Design a protein with these regions (language model features):
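SAM cofactor-binding core of SAM-dependent methyltransferases
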Residues: 1-34, 42, 48-49, 87
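Conserved acidic-Pro-Pro-aromatic motif
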Residues: 17, 39-169
Length: 169
């Protein structure tokens, strides 16, 4: 785990099973930030190919994924990312330099197996499509994905992010 906003002393970690660094995950390394590949190296997980990545980093997910090599991404069996700022999809620069490259990078080796729109932020109409500002996507590595591919939304375990707002699908 890594999070620049949390002090490790406040966590009840099980030594040998959990690893934590007080840094932001980003597309570069400095005293406060690190790349995904640096985190894997620091956690001594470079030989693993069965990792789970859950990323909710408020917009830094794009730079983090763009700067991560294909071989590093393939160390993860499952990737769960909350994508922010999707209202910018109407901006060509964001679409072509951030969103599309990230999706291409991930979909090269992963299948999207679940999509959950966040109902706590507004919906935008972009080219006739209703798009949430924030969307959580779950990806499963293709070489591990032997299950039946079914399309159904919502999933029975989906819950609202904001119980006071209507669910969006």
């Amino acid at each position: 785990m890594t999070d620049g906003s949390i002090k490790s002393e406040s966590l009840n970690l099980v030594e040998g099973y959990q690893y934590f660094q007080e840094k932001w995950l980003n597309g570069f390394n400095d005293k406060n930030s690190m790349t995904l590949s640096s985190w894997i190296c620091n956690a001594k997980l470079v030989n693993s190919n069965n990792l789970l990545l859950q990323m909710d980093i408020e917009g830094a997910e794009y730079e983090s994924i763009i700067t991560t090599s294909e071989s590093t991404l393939k160390q993860f069996r499952i990737i769960v990312i909350e994508f922010h700022n999707l209202d910018y999809l109407r901006n060509e620069r964001f679409l072509n330099q951030r969103f599309v490259p990230v999706m291409r990078r991930i979909l090269q080796n992963f299948d999207c197996i679940h999509a959950h729109p966040n109902n706590s932020s507004p919906i935008f109409n972009i080219c006739g499509f209703e798009v949430p500002k924030t969307l959580e996507l779950t990806f499963y590595r293709k070489d591990c994905n032997e299950g039946t591919k079914r399309k159904f939304i919502p999933h029975e375990k989906d819950i609202k992010n904001d119980p006071m707002q209507e669910q969006i699908y």
